[in-house]
From Swiss-Prot:
Residues 1-28, 134-327, 402-660, 761-805, 822-1173, 1291-1390, 1483-1502, 1656-1683 are annotated as: Disordered. One of its GO terms (biological process) is regulation of cytoskeleton organization. Residues 1-19, 154-204, 227-269, 434-447, 483-503, 521-552, 615-625, 768-800, 880-893, 909-928, 994-1028, 1071-1081, 1111-1131, 1483-1499, 1656-1676 have a biased composition (Low complexity). Belongs to the AF4 family. Residues 582-614 have a biased composition (Gly residues). Residues 402-414, 626-638, 647-659 have a biased composition (Polar residues). The lineage of its organism: Eukaryota, Metazoa, Ecdysozoa, Arthropoda, Hexapoda. Keywords: Developmental protein, DNA-binding, Nucleus, Pair-rule protein, Phosphoprotein, Transcription, Transcription regulation. This is AF4/FMR2 family member lilli. Residues 463-474 have a biased composition (Acidic residues). The modification Phosphoserine is found at residues 470, 472, 863-864, 920, 922, 1442. PROSITE patterns: HMGI_Y.
Length: 1770
């Protein structure tokens, strides 16, 4: 011990004589001289060899770093072997150089290894100590023992490995020094063995004897025998987390060893250079930067030389340790040092560091190095002096130095010894006591060991280290203290280990900074009492660890914490590694704590192998992060880490799976963010939208976040979130900011590491919140809208989210405006709500604002919002944001409604809303569940909600929702139109009459969309004159939300509003707003509706609170709707040409909208409908139901509805009856999802609707009996007074809402409730039963309606309608014919939901006919009634209404319904259109909204059957998001799900999680395809294909199993095959250009016949003909053609490319066969109906939506088998 102390003193003196105390320096010098002499005598030969090797290594420090990184694995082997060898052959330089410290494969293994390793170290230590006592040779002989002195001798070799290398090398060169070094090394030896053993790998198995086997000679390549050749990351699992640190430390140590060995032996005099270079194997390159950045950067000891000399300082610090040579001290050291196993266990997560630290049995040795770098008094004094002042910073420095030296964990801690008491406390609480006991003389050594433990912990928490980088402040402090204490040591040690250890220490130091500081001070005092101090430190460190562990005690909390850390900056892979390695316990906790601040460093660390461990140091030094020649696998984020393929390829590219935790939010080196799957933030599958972003844009971010968090917690975040991955980041943002104090260090996080630091943080924070609660539900956490269907979340207060099982938080977020906000507008008054120019923030918000706003505002408006044209949507978003205040003002009137719509609804709604999308609407509403987010993103994207409507229609119409769609469309139209009118920010005509005239202009569009929804009509009528204005509004021109406050029927409406205050009342408010937007709705009807619905949405949300206001709104809406209706028919005639032109013009916008919406809401988008798109249509239906239910539950409202219906009596009764019947049919098959969404709306804005839903489906469907209809119509006239302006339109709107709403609402309502799904299934069953009856009725009604329509067309009033009819359907006859055909077809394809569409169209036709028959007054009354009764529905239907208008235009396409429906009112056509045409109809419908003209153009409904299909050209590619944050979040989500699946025990959950991960990878690849290089995209696609193939092979046995899950597994397998097929096709497409070139080249080659023909027996002309060999071989050569190598290569490539094409088709066919053989046609048919068919032309976002929707359905089936069975029976 005395010798060790002397060595330490000498080394310290050599390294930092100026820093060491004079006495210590003198003693060290003297001792070193003596020891060097002895060592020279004993090791002259070794020194010579070592000097040469060390010189080479010294020259190749950089090489050594890389080499060490490569050798890291080799070192592992060697360490294993060397443990034995060193124990037996410690003096052998090579053997000693090979640190055979055991590596931990897992945390458990780490514990075992730590115990064994420490035991081995203990033996080595005893041998060294005892031998050292008897002779200095053991120290000298033992490279590790010797190594420590050289670092001290070599001011630069701070790492134990370099020290040991230098020690052994210089042991012979400097016998005296090596003796003292040996003693110190004995202390360090174990530490070095621990620290250097990994570097011991450095000594290559490649028998290069000259250099202690530390690292190759400079020129020698570091051979990585171990596959994970990134020396940075030890292959073993636990070490990986620490591997960054360890590998850094190892590579540093190896390089340090090489430098120390070669340099120390050869250049012991070079000591400082060697230590500098050695520690640097990395530090050499980062000699200055690592130390400065980590410690010198802290500025405490800026001079790298100081850092070089800290070895000397450490030697000085170790002067007290020489007494430690005493047996008692040795024993105590052994006891304490080797006891470190316990801390190591807690630090198990940081295998390398813990192992090394464990092996660094002598903390003093580490302290020696630490002191050497610090250049302060002997370890004992130095820790106190340096560590006391700089304690936190010093500890980090020491650890970095240590890592840079030999085994960064040990060495860095050793070098940090004095400075790293904190680190030891953190990582090595157990060890320091042991070390202290053993090394009482070297108190610093003990702290160093503690530091080692800390280093271990830090390395264990490599992520934590990186995360610590995030906590740059703490780490900087640590750096500062390190710089002061370890300025020189920090150079190497800091670079490699300071990142991991210092940041890790920083974590602990942050927590234990004071403790560590005290420890440093104590160490000064405890130099004499080092054992006690070590024990205290150990205890304190353990306490700290315990505290940390307490914090991390719960995995959830740990995850949360680590999430926060990672979010803070731990987002980096290192951070992820740390997070993943929570096993480190206290260390992990500390690391996590520092992670936020150190995350930046970690992030940079993740960039390089060294960066992972030194990433923290990178934060401090910034050099370590990129310095990692071989980044730890944790730094490699390429998908390969997620796939079986090795992640060694590019150190910067791939992060080893062990290092990166998918469960921990973080940022991969490429900037990709890993967001824990459990994060619920991605509630809706919003393609590129973030619900949270929308909310944020809508200023509802907080609300949204809260809602989403609630949903996450309550629902555990279903995976259904769909594409809106970024919302996680957004949601996380809050939590990250709130929960991550570590974020203070974020500034240090490298931008390259965190592309989206804020988002990563947010996602991490949120992830931490939801990750803990929802980690279990990782797969489901992404979609809050996918919350358990049976789970009914009580509606929260205003601003909170109504958590509905199937609806995303954003949608359900009820922007509860207090009733005061929903003050009813005075009757006959126009409420103008100024809307900020939408263009201000149109596009960005287009996705987010709407989303957020819808989430905030009443969900009901989702569908209405969908209907708004994209421009309107955009305007809506802007208006939502700009008119947020306006909404507050007009909330009572209109704005709330708009909000909801803005969400995800628009897409689907536009898809289904426009074309009688009841079924589509239900699909849309389900899609809206996730759609709100999508819509929010897509709405802006798709400026034509018509697109969304058409898309919806594509979904539902393709799903044969023609019949369903019409009904739904009607309902939607009513509610939507109303909602839209309210929300539409437009220069709306102030009064009803003006609206009527305006409606005339917008009447076509109004008809399209308003026929389906009275609200829509009303809004159109009010905005018909402002239709162009609306368009402008859509264009974000100055907009005012014009609310027609017609309260002529206020009392009745009030009743209705009271009845349907939640649904109808809100609908009424929506209607009021809808009427203004209705005119502009035509193309922009969706937009207007969108805008309107945004405002009314708030109202709807408010309405439940203020039913009275709602009823007023209902009245207003109803009047608006009525006027819209009337205006549609009346002014529609006048403005037909104009409207048609507008529509045609709008068609383009609609097409754009449709295209966008199609992309957004494409059924393939994976449940846009399911995931939170709320189809207002449902509310309309619900409103109808409300009418029925109100009559039953609330007599007065029902009477009001009856009055309105009386107006509608001739046709409406039939229509209503048909609607009731039709709606059931519609909602039957694919609308479960939609129903959920719709229910969401109803729940948000209508309470009575729920009551109505309580009614049996049959009651709801047929609730309005003819008598009831008559009664309602009778009552209706009183209300029509209010809506007298648009009677015709009112008719259409009213029927639609009445028709679809009852059943859809019932179904949706049911879905919202736990039993709702069952109810929905029952409803579907009843609907199926009723379908036959309804079909019969519908047929008759359709005939009657056709007749009526013909009459109306003939009539002057019906002239325009005729135009519509003619436009919709070429002629009444054609319409009738089409209706009949469609009815028959629907009936035939009853199972396919076609029957439902038929019923709906029939109802629509009947209604339309009735409406046409009815006078405008009647229509107005009916419309008002519909608006009043379905006030809430109006809000919902308003959005749908816009689509309805579009759909109406397209309705001609649907044979029976369209032909009949379109002419009378856009309602029927829209229904049909929706059902038939998904996207194109919306555009066409919008164009047709003009009325006849568009209708006529669309009129050729010849493709009656085609109506169910959408044109291939209707689907436009979704606008790609350039938001890298979202792209990163996709990757994070994918990684999280992949990791969650890895740890999942249930086979079904595992396979679904894997498949979810795959589709998220596909989203990532899709986004990369637009932003990254083709090669990167190719790689991720190829890796994803490998992953999915692996998954498929893994779960193949389950497909044949006879257990109940084999069918579900088969369905998942089919989805998997589809994905594989599309990925294969994508791989071909990515190489299509290359393939074309290759084919052309090969074609030319074969055409020209180039190439020499070789006869079978003709000897080669190359060799002599006499050549026996040539003859012999030639004689056996078959005849053939010599193909040039180039051609052969091209043939190989061609084969590869064409194999992808072949595989794509083979896999697709295989999936089709499985569908048929497994009798899964119904399942996939329903999926196609709801989400659009999945084809080989589908885009990745569509694949994502489709697969997500399918997996959600399967999950629901598994979790609710009874409901599923019920559904099947239905």
């Amino acid at each position: 011990m005395a010798q060790q102390q002397q060595q330490q003193q000498q080394q310290q003196h050599l390294q930092h004589p100026h820093q060491n105390t004079n006495s210590n320096n003198q003693l060290q010098q003297q001792q070193q001289q003596l020891q060097l002499q002895l060592q020279l005598q004993l090791q002259e030969q070794q020194e010579q060899q070592q000097q040469q090797l060390q010189l080479q290594q010294y020259n190749n420090n950089f090489y050594s770093q890389n080499y060490n990184m490569e050798e890291y694995e080799r070192r592992k082997r060697r360490e294993r072997e060397k443990i034995e060898r060193q124990q037996g052959i410690q003096i052998d330089d090579r053997e000693t150089a090979l640190f055979s410290e055991p590596r931990r494969l897992t945390e458990g293994d780490a514990e075992i290894t730590a115990a064994l390793g420490e035991f081995g170290d203990a033996r080595v230590y005893i041998n060294q100590s005892t031998v050292g006592i008897s002779r200095h040779a053991p120290g000298a002989g033992n490279p590790r023992l010797q190594a420590p002195p050289p670092p001290k001798t070599l001011g630069h070799s701070h790492s134990p490995s370099s020290s040991s290398a230098a020690g052994s090398g210089s042991g012979s060169a400097l016998p005296g020094q090596s003796q003292s070094q040996q003693q110190q090394q004995k202390q360090h030896y174990q530490q070095q063995q621990q620290q250097q053993r990994p570097p011991g790998y450095l000594k290559q198995a490649d028998n290069k004897p000259p250099y202690n086997g530390r690292g190759g000679y400079p020129g020698q390549p570091m051979k990585n025998d171990i596959p994970s050749s990134s020396g940075m990351a030890p292959p073993r699992g636990p070490p990986r987390s620490g591997s960054g640190s360890i590998s850094n430390s190892n590579s540093n140590s190896s390089s340090a060893t090489n430098n120390a060995t070669g340099g120390a032996a050869g250049t012991t005099p070079l000591g400082p250079p060697l230590s500098t270079q050695m520690p640097n194997g990395r530090e050499k390159s980062f000699l200055g930067p690592p130390a400065p950045a980590l410690h010198n950067g802290a500025g405490l000891f800026v001079p790298p030389a100081a850092s070089k000399r800290p070895g000397g300082g450490s030697g000085a610090g170790l002067q007290p340790p020489p007494p430690e040579k005493d047996i008692t001290k040795m024993i105590s050291e052994m006891t304490n040092s080797f006891r470190v196993t316990a801390p190591l266990t807690s630090i198990a997560a940081t295998p390398h560091a813990p192992t090394r630290e464990n092996y660094n049995l002598n903390g003093p040795n580490t302290n020696k190095y630490a002191f050497g770098p610090i250049g302060s008094p002997p370890i004992g004094s130095q820790p106190s002096s340096l560590m006391a002042p700089l304690f936190a910073p010093i500890a980090p420095i020491a650890s970095p130095i240590t890592s840079l030296l030999t085994t960064p964990p040990h060495a860095s801690q050793g070098s940090l010894g004095g400075a790293s008491p904190v680190a030891p406390l953190q990582q090595l609480p157990p060890t320091p006591p042991k070390a202290a006991a053993a090394l009482s003389p070297t108190a610093a050594a003990k702290p160093l060991k503690t530091e080692k433990n800390h280093t271990l912990e830090k390395q264990d928490s490599c992520l934590e280290n990186d995360l610590e980088l995030s906590e740059s402040e703490d780490e900087q402090r640590k750096k500062e203290s390190r710089s002061a204490g370890n300025s020189s040591n920090s150079s190497e040690s800091d670079s490699s280990e300071s990142g991991s250890e210092s940041s890790s220490k920083g974590d602990h130091q942050q927590q234990h900074h004071h403790h560590n500081h005290h420890h440093q001070q104590q160490q000064q005092q405890l130099q004499q009492q080092q054992q006690q101090q070590l024990l205290q430190q150990k205890q304190q460190h353990q306490q700290i660890l315990q505290q940390q562990q307490r914090q991390l005690t719960a995995n959830g909390s740990k995850k949360k914490y680590s999430h926060s850390i990672i979010a803070g900056g731990g987002s980096t892979i290192s951070g992820l590694l740390t997070s993943s390695g929570f096993g480190s316990g206290g260390a992990g906790n500390g690391g996590c704590s520092t992670a936020s601040s150190g995350g930046g460093g970690g992030g940079s660390g993740s960039g390089g192998g060294s960066g992972s461990s030194s990433g923290i140091g990178t934060m401090s030094s910034g050099s370590s992060s990129n310095k990692t020649p071989s980044p730890t696998e944790s730094n490699k984020w390429t998908l390969s880490r997620f796939f079986p393929k090795p992640a060694n390829q590019t150190s910067s590219e791939s992060v080893s799976p062990g290092n990166v935790s998918m469960k921990v939010p973080g940022i991969l080196p490429g900037g990709a963010q890993i967001i824990p799957e459990s994060i619920e933030v991605t509630t809706a599958i919003v393609k590129n939208e973030k619900i949270h972003d929308d909310h944020m844009d809508m200023d509802e971010v907080e609300e949204e976040d809260e809602d989403e968090e609630q949903l996450q917690q309550q629902q555990q975040l279903r995976y259904g979130a769909g594409l809106s991955v970024t919302p996680v980041a957004v949601a996380v943002k809050k939590e990250a900011l709130d929960g991550v104090g570590e974020m203070g260090g974020l500034p240090a996080i490298p931008k390259n590491q965190i592309k989206r630091e804020a988002e990563a943080l947010h996602s991490a924070a949120r992830l931490s919140d939801s990750g803990t609660s929802g980690s279990g539900s990782t797969s489901s956490s992404s979609s809050s809208s996918d919350s358990a269907p049976g789970e009914v979340v009580p509606m929260p207060g205003p601003g909170e989210t109504l958590q509905l099982p199937g609806v995303p938080a954003a949608i359900t977020t009820v922007m509860r405006v207090h009733p005061t906000l929903m003050q009813k507008a005075p009757p006959n008054s126009v409420t103008l709500t100024p809307i900020l120019p939408l263009p201000a923030s149109p596009k960005q918000r287009q996705k987010k604002p709407r989303k957020k706003k819808p989430a905030t505002s009443a969900p009901i408006l989702d569908s209405s919002d969908d209907d708004d044209p994209p421009a309107a949507k955009h305007a809506l978003e802007l208006s939502a944001a700009a008119a947020a205040a306006a909404q507050a003002q007009a909330t009572a009137t209109v704005p709330p409604l708009a909000v909801k719509k803005g969400r995800g609804r628009p897409r689907k709604q536009q898809q289904s809303g426009g074309s009688g999308n009841l079924s589509s609407a239900s699909a849309g509403s389900s899609s809206q569940t996730k759609g709100p987010t999508l819509t929010a993103a897509k709405k802006p994207l798709v400026k034509g909600p018509a697109m969304a409507n058409s898309r919806k229609r594509d979904h539902s119409s393709q799903s044969s929702s023609n019949g369903n769609t019409p009904t739904k469309k009607l309902a939607m139209g009513t509610g939507t139109g109303t909602g839209t009118a309210m929300a539409v920010p437009m220069t709306v005509i102030p009064s009803g009459p003006a609206n009527a005239s305006a409606v005339a202009a917008a009447s076509s569009s109004s008809d399209e969309d308003s026929s389906s929804s009275t609200g829509s009509t009303g809004s159109k009528s009010s905005s018909s004159s402002s239709s162009s204005d609306d368009t402008e509004t859509t264009q974000n021109t100055k907009c005012r939300i014009v609310k027609l406050n017609k309260t002529g029927a206020v009392p009745p409406l009030a009743r209705l509003g009271a009845v349907a205050s939640a649904g109808a009342g809100a609908g009424a408010g929506a209607s009021g707003s809808s009427s203004p937007s209705s005119s502009s709705s035509e193309p922009e009807d969706h937009l207007a509706m969108s805008t309107v619905s945004a405002l009314p949405m708030a109202q709807q949300l408010m309405q439940p609170y203020k039913p009275r206001a709602v009823s007023q709104h209902s009245q207003q809406l109803s009047s608006s709707e009525c006027s819209s209706s009337s205006g549609s028919s009346t002014s529609g005639d006048e403005d037909e040409a104009k409207r048609e032109k507008e529509r045609e013009r709008k068609r383009k916008s609609d097409k754009n909208k449709i295209s966008t919406l199609t992309r957004i809401f494409n059924p393939k988008e994976g449940g846009a409908k399911k995931q939170g798109q709320v189809v207002i249509m449902d509310q309309s239906e619900e409103q109808q139901q409300v009418k029925v239910g109100d009559s039953s539950s609330q007599p007065v409202p029902v009477q009001n509805a009856a009055i309105a219906k009386l107006r509608m009596t001739p046709t409406q009764q039939q229509q209503q009856l048909g609607a009731g019947l039709a709606s059931p049919a519609r909602t039957t098959t694919p609308h479960l999802t939609s129903l959920i969404c719709k229910i969401d709306l109803s729940k948000l804005s209508r309470e009575r609707i729920m009551r109505l839903k309580k009614l049996t489906p049959s009651q709801q469907n047929g609730h309005l009996t003819p008598k009831d209809l008559v009664t309602i119509q009778t009552q209706g006239p009183s209300q029509p007074v209010q809506g007298h302006l648009l009677p015709a339109k009112v008719k259409h709107e009213h029927p639609h809402p009445v028709k679809p709403e009852p059943e859809l609402d019932a179904g949706y309502e049911s879905k919202f409730k736990p039993g709702n799904v069952k109810q929905e299934f029952q409803l579907k069953q009843e609907r199926d039963r009723e379908r036959e009856r309804e079909r019969d009725r519908d047929r008759e009604r359709e005939r009657e309606r056709e007749r009526d329509r013909e009459r109306e067309r003939e009539q002057p009033t019906g002239g325009r309608r005729r135009k519509r009819s003619s436009s919709s359907s070429s002629s009444p006859y054609k319409e009738k014919k089409r209706k009949k055909e469609k009815s028959d077809h629907l009936q035939i394809s009853k199972d396919q939901l076609l029957p439902v569409p038929v019923l709906l169209p029939s109802n629509n036709h009947e209604r339309i006919s009735c409406h046409e028959r009815l006078s405008f007054d009647k229509l107005q009354l009916l419309h008002e009634d519909a608006a009043a009764v379905a006030a809430a529905a109006a809000a919902v239907s308003a959005p749908n209404g816009s689509p309805s208008k579009k759909l109406l235009v397209m309705s001609p396409l649907p044979p029976p319904p369209t032909a009949v429906v379109v002419p009378p009112a856009v309602v029927a056509p829209s229904t049909c259109s929706e059902a038939v045409q998904t996207t194109p109809p919306s555009a066409a419908a919008t164009a047709t909204a003009a009325t006849s003209t568009t209708g006529t153009s669309t009129a050729p409904p010849a493709p009656v059957t085609r109506l169910i299909y959408r044109s291939y050209f209707d689907r436009e590619e979704e606008p790609h998001s350039d938001d890298h944050r979202k792209n990163n979040q996709f990757l994070v989500e994918a990684v999280n799900r992949k990791h969650a699946a890895d740890s999942e025990r249930d086979s079904f959950n595992q396979v679904t999680l894997y498949l979810e991960a795959v589709v998220y990878f596909l989203l990532t690849a899709d986004s990369m395809e637009r932003s990254s290089s083709e090669q990167a995209t190719w790689t991720i696609y190829k890796d994803t294909l490998s992953l999915i193939k692996f998954i498929s092979s893994k779960f193949r046995p389950y497909q044949q199993s006879t257990n109940g899950q084999h069918e579900t597994h088969n369905k998942v397998a089919i989805l998997s095959l589809r994905c594989q097929s599309l990925i294969s096709l994508k791989l071909y497409k990515l190489r299509r250009t290359n393939c074309r070139t290759v084919i052309n080249s090969l074609t030319e080659f074969f055409r020209t016949g180039r190439g020499d023909i070789v006869n079978g027996n003709t000897p080669s002309s190359i060799s002599p003909s006499n050549s026996v060999g040539s003859q012999g071989s030639g004689s056996n050569t078959p005849p053939g053609k010599i193909v040039p190598q180039e051609i052969h290569t091209q043939l190989s490539k061609q084969n590869e490319y064409l194999t992808y094409v072949n595989s794509a088709h083979e896999l697709w066919d295989q999936a089709d066969r499985l569908v048929r053989t497994g009798n899964h046609i119904d399942f996939f048919r329903e999926l196609d109906h709801e989400n659009g068919p999945l084809t080989l032309h589908s885009t990745m976002p569509e694949v994502f939506r489709y697969v997500q929707a399918g997996l959600k359905t399967l999950r629901d089936a598994v979790s609710h088998p009874t409901q599923q069975t019920l559904h099947q029976s239905h």
